[in-house]
């Protein structure tokens, strides 16, 4: 008989205002995104998670629509012992299909913050 060992749950860390912003989302959006983040905590990738362009592997985005609005959460699973939520925001329509530069820049800055936090709390990331 084969035994399947469950992956250990990685703690979820929120960078900057990401948790406060996430908690402002509609309940249905929080539930769906929360499920995706939970899958990431156990080492998986939710079907709704897509790569975030420009920051390399392990940075993912979940997009949910609700009442004509688009909500996004960007997180990273590139660390061995933790998952970091980098940004949660409602997509602004004036920028069209592209994500606003301020959001792209904020994600990049918060990834650097997450890297520093991870090193401080867990030690150097193995490459």
Q: What is each model feature region?
A:
Residues 1-70, 79-80, 90-127:
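Basic, Lys/Arg-enriched alpha-helical interface segments
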Residues 73-75:
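Hydrophobic/aromatic beta-strand elements that line small-molecule binding cavities or substrate pockets
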Residues 77-85:
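Active-site beta-strand-loop-beta-strand hairpin of nuclease catalytic cores
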